[in-house]
Structures are given as structure tokens and as C-alpha cells.
Amino acid sequence: MAGRGGLLMLENFIGGKFLPCSSYLDSYDPSTGEVYCHVPNSGKEEIEAAVEAARAAFPGWSSRSPQERSQVLQRLADLLEQSLEELAQAESKDQGKTITLARTMDIPRAVHNFRFFASSILHHTSECTQMDHLGCLHYTVRAPVGIAALISPWNLPLYLLTWKIAPAIAAGNTVIAKPSELTSVTAWMMCRLLEKAGVPPGVVNIVFGTGPRVGEALVSHPEVPLISFTGSQPTAERIMQLSAPHCKKLSLELGGKNPAVIFEDANLAECIPTTVRSSFANQGEICLCTSRIFVQRSIYSEFLKRFVEAARMWKVGIPSDPSADMGALISKAHLEKVRSYIKKARMEGAQILCGEGVDKLNLPPRNQAGYFMLPTVITDVKDESCCMKEEIFGPVTCVVPFDSEEEVIQRANNVKYGLAATVWSGNVGRVHRVAKKLQSGLVWTNCWLIRELNLPFGGMKSSGVGREGAKDSYEFFTEVKTITVKH
């Protein structure tokens, strides 16, 4: 709906209805730095209303068969697909990502999330064992848990929101979702499709606002037994504190400091363009992006030269430009945070080979105040540097040499995170050997970001708790019961 000054004004979606809020937050267009819409600044009152709606909807929705719920998810996928271009344009404007990425990755993946879980919910099986000597049969059944709190981040807004909503409602739960207040538009747009798809009122509730106000009210509510969160480690720690008194079930997908390990027998013709993409896709604002590149010393100079040349070829432009490879970062505060790491690297004696402070960024006059930054490559940086230890979450990557396999495994693992890694080598034995030793929940070899949704997704160490995927998400969003029948 139109709000103050003709700007878009979002509303909460509770119990199948759009409801206004008493106060609103400004939301900025990352490409211009200008306010372009208003987002509800919700709090405890809105969460109470959402809990009431979700509670009322749970008995009816949970009693529907998996086949019935599957049909609803399929219809919602169809409606999202029919709105693909509208959603892609909104996602690009709201988040700063390129329109090409929104069209080819974000929105198609949101569609696929519903289709995937609409199918997978039909194929889960239960366990059964017999104890003939005691005349007993044991079997398991799974049931939905109740109300799920789903908190999604700003980097892949609809993509990751639907990755949580789809398995939660497929399993028979009702949900209260809180998208990031920085990127709320496509979630609001999806709400308009829920009734058409046949989603009953109260099954999906979306409440907008900040973490401290609405997020804390949601995760601490005693009637919300499930929390699925994707975001930062400090926020996850706060969620754990607030939920601990209620012994809630948690799924936490957090950050990464992901290494690429490039051996001397790597196919550089494939490795270099893929590693540029894994470093800078979506402005480096993907938890799976590569931010530490270890290159075997014998090919280090050649790799570095070609990698920097390829990085400089990436076009930073306004998000609506189909030829742009990178758009704008999410906010002014985030841009300043990312730039601060470049300053720290310089102070530590590192070299900036391209990007921030080295190359010139050319933008149209209207976008001069936007949150843009060039792909930046850092070298001569120590493993103990903050740029090699901390998640920057921007278009910044460090390239360093290594000598031996044992050495690089130790160095790659020498961070608190363990989300993803890539390994490049033509030696199949080495690929398997190194992949097993890397402390990462996901390891891609000679590729990046090829996903199989049936398999577990998640990280080790400080990169999270739990896994997501067909089997893992189903188990998280259900409770298992063992039944014994003596005959």
C-alpha cells in the first residue's frame, strides 16, 4: 500500500489479514541511499496476535494429510513463478543485488523450495523393528511440533525465508516469520499469494521489525517451541540465552570464513572464474562466499595475476543493469564496516591489489550516494590478521601461498568457523583426502555452490547448530514418537 509521501508502506500479515502497525521504520534503496519504503516496527503486541493466530490454525493444518499440504505448496510455487519478474525486480531494488542474480537464482530458488518440500513430504518413511522373542512390534511416528519461529537474513531474502517456511508448513506446523527489517518487501509480496494458494489463515504469519523488539519477543515466547535462524553468531547467542529457559528446539545457520585450497595441478581455466564468482557473487554477501584463498606456491604468481585481472573485469553497476556483475551492499553501516577491514589490512602491512582505494568506481550521478564497492583482493596478509579470521561479508578476499598439503589443511582449519570450503585439484585421491580433513560442513571440489537439497546443509564449530535439507529439515520440524505394541 502507498504510505507517507507516496512511498510503499508494508503491513504485518497475521491470521490471513494485513494489519497496520503503530510505528514504522525507514527502508533504504541501497543503490541510491534514499528512503523508498516503510516497514512495520513491530513488538510484543504483534507477536501475541501472531501466536494467537498460529495457535488457532494449528489443529486444522496439522490434521491435513501430507498429500493435501503438498498440493497447497505446489500451488504457492506456481503463483510465485507466475510473479517471478515482479518479485525479482523488487528483490533487486530492496537488497541491492543485480537483477540478473534475482532473476536467475533468488526467485527461482524460492519457487523450487516450495516444489522440493511439496515432493519430499510425500516420501518420508518410519522405522519399524520386531522383537519376536517378546512378541513386540516397535515403530515410529512423526508429528508436527507446533508454532515455529523463522528468522531469515537480508542477503538472500525470499530465497532463505522460503527455505524455512516450506519445510515447516509441509510438516504440518504453523509459523511466525520475521524477515530482516532491511529487506522485507518480497516477504510482504508473497503474503498476497498465500490465500490464493489455499494456505489457511494463521498458518503463515509474517511480522516485520527489528531483532531487539520483535525478534526477542518471538524467540522468548513460551508457546513457540521451535526456532530456525539464519544470521550472525552474536544474534544466535542471544537467541540461545532467551530460549534456554523453555528448552526450545534450535536450528542455527551462522557465518563462515570459507577457504579455497588451490593445488598446483588445478585447472586454472575453470578455477579462476569460479573462484572470482565464489568471492564476489551477491557483493560477497553470501555465507558460502570464499574469503580466504590458499594457492600452492609454484602457481601462486600466475594465479594471482590472472585472478586480479578477472576480478577487475567484474562490472559494478546499478542493480537494474542486466550487464552488472555486482550491485550495491545492503546498507551504509555495512559498507563502512567492510571498508574498515581494508583500512586494518593496510595498517597491518598487507597489499591491496585491486578494488577499494586502488581502482576508480564509476557510477551515474543519482547513485553516487549508493552503497557500492569494487571487488577487492588482499595479499601479503598474515593468517592471524582480522581479515583472515573474521567474517567480512563483502566483496573482499585474501590470497596467500602455501607449500604442503598438511600445512594448508592446518591453516584452512585455523578459524572458529566451519561452514564451507572449496578444493581445486586434478588428483582424485587428494581431493577426497583433503575434503575429509577440512573442518567444514560443506566441501565443494572443482566447483562451487552446486546444491543437492536432499543432503544436509550446515556448518561445524561456530558456523551453526543443526542441519537443513530434505531429511534434516523434516526431522527438525517434527517430533518422533516410538510406539511399542505387544501381541
From Swiss-Prot:
Which EC number(s) does UniProt give? 1.2.1.32
Q: Which UniProt keywords apply?
A: Cytoplasm, NAD, Oxidoreductase
Pathway participation: Amino-acid degradation; L-kynurenine degradation
Gene3D superfamilies in the record, alphabetically? Answer: Aldehyde Dehydrogenase, Chain A, domain 1 (3.40.605.10), Aldehyde Dehydrogenase, Chain A, domain 2 (3.40.309.10)
Q: Where does this protein reside within or beyond the cell?
A: Cytoplasm
One Gene Ontology BP term is: retinoic acid metabolic process
Keyword check for Metal-binding, yes or no.
no
A cellular component annotation (GO) from this entry = cytoplasm
> What organism is the protein native to?
Bos taurus (Bovine)
The main location is cytoplasm
| MF GO annotations | aminomuconate-semialdehyde dehydrogenase activity; retinal dehydrogenase activity
Which protein, by its recorded name, is this?
2-aminomuconic semialdehyde dehydrogenase
Binding-site list for NAD(+): G231, S232, Q233, P234, T235, A236
Active site: which residues? Answer: E253, C287
Q: One Pfam annotation, family name?
A: Aldedh
Q: Which domain of life is it from?
A: Eukaryota
User: Quick one: which gene encodes this?
Assistant: ALDH8A1
